[in-house]
């Protein structure tokens, strides 16, 4: 009996090793090498044209990719429009603030690709978003990297599926680590991806608690740089519309760089979830390292983005190539 059990275990082990994770195995940088060989150049051109219209395209696209991948995987389900019978992901409260320019650049790139007969209905919206995300990072002077392709578009998008799957502005390191671990991402990946906050903006309503009503002892979060706290109070007075936008990075808001970590060292992290990366002993060494070593940070960011792009990838069995990125076929 023991010998039989051993044979079964060995057989199963061999079977598992012979059939790796198909969702990862299907991804490759030249996935469209035969069907649409110029896909990267076409998407890049659209991205560049869109950025000329508005800088918001850069942070909007980067944030859209993250929000998509963290809810049911990188399958462009965040792009689906709600219908009378289905409230989609994009209409969940956590996604309402996603800027339209991120959606628009994907839609425009899809249109440009479909205008080429050999590419028409061949490239998934999920892959377009992944490519556009790399291109906006590069446009902001961030690192370039090869994008793995071969994702299929998701067949489901519900607002309910967003619940509890996206990090919040008040999360602590333990909460962040658990959330990222669900997607096979490490603490180092979490810190690297958090640095996407070197770009873009947030809304005043997300920081009111840190600058006016932190706790019973302190009105202002004591981990906030005092001068920075006053700047935030001027930008976000108590009576201001909570939707008013403020820069995530007060120093270089239009450039992808490691200044994000230097800001944390000075108490200038906008969200609690940013500043805790420096105040928590588990993550502080990494923050200090990347604050002085941009090469190490860029390398870690590329690794994290590649791993993020593999989360929940759909195959031909549970996905398709959407004709309209905002609607199911």
Curated annotation (Swiss-Prot):
Broad class of enzyme this protein falls into: oxidoreductase
Catalytic reaction(s) noted: 2 a phenolic donor + H2O2 = 2 a phenolic radical donor + 2 H2O
Cofactor remark: Binds 1 heme b (iron(II)-protoporphyrin IX) group per subunit.
PROSITE patterns per UniProt: PEROXIDASE_1, PEROXIDASE_4
Keywords: Calcium, Disulfide bond, Glycoprotein, Heme, Hydrogen peroxide, Iron, Metal-binding, Oxidoreductase, Peroxidase, Secreted, Signal
Residues engaged in binding Ca(2+) 2: 198, 249, 252, 257
Positions of the catalytic residues: 67
Organ and tissue specificity: Expressed in the whole plant, with the highest expression in roots.
Enzyme Commission (EC) number: 1.11.1.7
GO molecular function: heme binding; lactoperoxidase activity; metal ion binding
Residues of this chain annotated as glycosylated in UniProt: 215
Domain of life: Eukaryota
UniProt cross-references to InterPro entries, sorted A to Z: Haem_peroxidase, Haem_peroxidase_sf, Peroxidase_pln, Peroxidases_heam-ligand_BS, Secretory_peroxidase
Entry cofactors: heme b; Ca(2+)
PANTHER family: PEROXIDASE 35-RELATED, PTHR31517
Additional observations: There are 73 peroxidase genes in A.thaliana.
Family: Belongs to the peroxidase family. Classical plant (class III) peroxidase subfamily.
Protein name: Peroxidase 73
Biological source species: Arabidopsis thaliana
Gene encoding the protein: PER73
């Amino acid at each position: 009996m023991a010998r039989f059990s051993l044979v079964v275990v060995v057989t199963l082990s061999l079977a598992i090793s012979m059939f790796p994770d198909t969702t990862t195995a299907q991804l490759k940088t030249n996935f469209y090498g035969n069907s649409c060989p110029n896909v990267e150049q076409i998407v890049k051109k659209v991205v560049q044209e869109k950025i000329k219209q508005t800088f918001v395209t850069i942070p909007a696209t980067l944030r859209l990719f993250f929000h998509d991948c963290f809810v049911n995987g990188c399958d462009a389900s965040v792009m689906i429009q709600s219908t009378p019978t289905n409230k989609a992901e994009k209409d969940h409260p956590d996604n309402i603030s996603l800027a339209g320019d991120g959606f628009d650049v994907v839609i425009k790139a899809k249109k440009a690709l479909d205008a080429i007969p050999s590419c028409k209905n061949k490239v998934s919206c999920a892959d377009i978003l992944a490519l556009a995300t790399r291109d906006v990072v590069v446009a902001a002077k961030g690192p370039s990297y090869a994008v793995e392709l071969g994702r299929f578009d998701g067949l489901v998008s519900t607002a309910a599926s967003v619940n509890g799957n996206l990090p919040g502005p008040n999360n602590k390191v333990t909460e962040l680590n658990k959330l990222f671990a669900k997607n096979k991402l490490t603490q180092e990946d979490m810190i690297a991806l958090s640095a996407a906050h070197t770009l873009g903006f947030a809304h005043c309503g997300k920081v009111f608690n840190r600058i006016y009503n932190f706790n019973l002892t302190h009105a202002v979060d004591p981990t906030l740089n005092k001068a920075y706290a006053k700047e935030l109070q001027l930008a976000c007075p108590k009576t201001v519309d909570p939707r008013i936008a403020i820069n995530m990075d007060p120093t270089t808001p239009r450039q992808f760089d490691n200044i994000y970590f230097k800001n944390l060292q000075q108490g200038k992290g906008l969200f609690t979830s940013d500043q805790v990366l420096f105040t928590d002993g588990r993550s502080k060494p990494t923050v200090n390292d990347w604050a002085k070593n941009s090469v190490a940070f860029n390398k870690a960011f590329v690794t994290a983005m590649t791993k993020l792009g593999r989360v929940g990838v759909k195959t031909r069995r549970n996905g398709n190539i959407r004709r309209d990125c905002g609607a199911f076929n």
